[in-house]
């Protein structure tokens, strides 16, 4: 046979048939991945969307209001700053101490604060009234503002009657954006950890278990009764015992397999501490001024020195911002007394 006629036959693919088994590998996840930064980025292109006759803020004011009380270390520094500012504020005939408290709190929470000037018949200002920043919107037309607590019935303010104090943003110039925006993820994580631990205790201090039964001696009625008893043991009053009678059952006929031991494996304390540090770093309030106990033996240091540094670095700039109303009114409406610790140290 010539070499040209010698052809190499292809090898047959060996197949193995194991009966009628059609087992296949399957990969699955318990939940879909959650994107952290995706669709919300398009809002940076929109800046402030026009809604009817006013601009909507770039950040949801309702969301900021809900997040305000989401975590202890988020609201406590804001209240602390507000309380110190109110204690140093000298009341004026146009602006009471209570109205100033609302004016300062809105600026600290929303980075926007609005004061409405009420005029007499001669055109003079008789009172400055704070308008809730959560519902106040800047109008599309110049020097116009709207109070929008309901889209069905918006209220327009008189032209040139609203003073708008804002913390400047890098993406738009219509509304202010809070400085603490970067720490909101830590605030929400802190809240989620607290809510999870609360549900964990309400569930009977366990993460759940699998009740495995392989004993043929049990009847369907017994299984249904056990299932009903387990359902009723969840929630309030969950610390109760269950009785199961199986005279012809096997030793391992009933097994309780715990899913996880949360008390030993979760990172509740670590999450709380890390998120607390993030929030305090963003708010720039010394921990000793908020009543936080130190974890080390050395403590946080001298509280008076920390208070003086806080007054110089944080309170003084806030006071300067809040006093911008004086230039708009043409009168010294907002004025502060000296901080006692700075006077005593001077």
Which residues fall in each region the model found?
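Flexible, gly/proline-biased loop segments at the beginnings
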Residues: 1-135, 174, 299, 303, ...
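Extended, charged amphipathic alpha-helical segments
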Residues: 2-14, 18, 153-286, 290-300, ...
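Short, charged N-terminal helix-start/capping segments
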Residues: 24-52, 139-147, 190-212, 245, ...
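Short N-terminal helix-initiation segments at or just after the protein's N-terminus
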Residues: 52-63, 90-93, 145-159, 185-188, ...
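Short amphipathic alpha-helical surface micro-motifs
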Residues: 95-99, 108-110, 128, 144-147, ...
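Short, well-ordered loop/turn elements at secondary-structure boundaries
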Residues: 109-111, 121-124, 141-142, 205-206, ...
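Residues in well-ordered beta-strands of folded domains
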Residues: 116-118, 129, 148, 212, ...
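Active-site and NAD+-binding cores of ADP-ribose-processing enzymes
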Residues: 120-176
């Amino acid at each position: 046979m010539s070499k040209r006629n010698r052809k190499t036959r292809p090898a047959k693919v060996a197949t193995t048939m194991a009966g009628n088994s059609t087992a296949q590998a399957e990969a699955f996840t318990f939940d879909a991945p959650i994107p952290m930064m995706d669709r919300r980025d398009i809002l940076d292109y929109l800046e402030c969307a026009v809604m009817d006759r006013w601009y909507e803020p770039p950040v949801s004011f309702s969301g900021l209001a809900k997040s305000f009380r989401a975590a202890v270390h988020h609201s406590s520094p804001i209240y602390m700053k507000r309380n110190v500012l109110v204690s140093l504020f000298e009341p004026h005939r146009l602006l009471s101490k209570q109205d100033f408290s609302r004016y300062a709190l809105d600026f600290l929470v929303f980075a926007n604060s609005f004061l409405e000037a009420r005029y007499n018949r001669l055109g003079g200002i008789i009172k400055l009234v704070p308008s809730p920043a959560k519902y106040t919107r800047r109008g599309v037309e110049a020097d116009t503002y709207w109070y929008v607590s309901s889209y069905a019935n918006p209220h327009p303010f008189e032209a040139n009657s609203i003073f708008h104090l804002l913390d400047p943003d890098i993406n738009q110039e219509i509304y202010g954006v809070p400085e603490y925006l970067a720490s909101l993820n830590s605030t929400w994580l802190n809240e989620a950890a607290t809510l999870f631990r609360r549900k964990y205790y309400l569930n009977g201090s366990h993460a759940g278990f699998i009740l495995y039964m392989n004993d043929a001696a049990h009847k369907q009625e017994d299984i249904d009764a056990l299932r009903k008893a387990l359902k009723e043991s969840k929630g309030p009053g969950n610390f109760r015992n269950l009785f199961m009678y199986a005279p012809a059952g096997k030793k391992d006929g009933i097994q309780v397999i715990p899913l996880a031991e949360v008390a030993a494996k979760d990172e509740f304390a670590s999450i709380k501490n890390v998120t607390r540090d993030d929030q305090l770093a963003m708010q720039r309030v010394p921990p000793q001024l908020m009543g936080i106990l130190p974890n080390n033996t050395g403590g946080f240091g001298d509280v008076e020195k920390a208070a003086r540094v806080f007054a110089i670095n944080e309170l003084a700039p806030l006071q300067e911002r809040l006093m911008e109303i004086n230039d708009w009114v043409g009168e010294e409406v907002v004025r502060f007394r000296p901080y006692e610790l700075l006077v005593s140290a001077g």
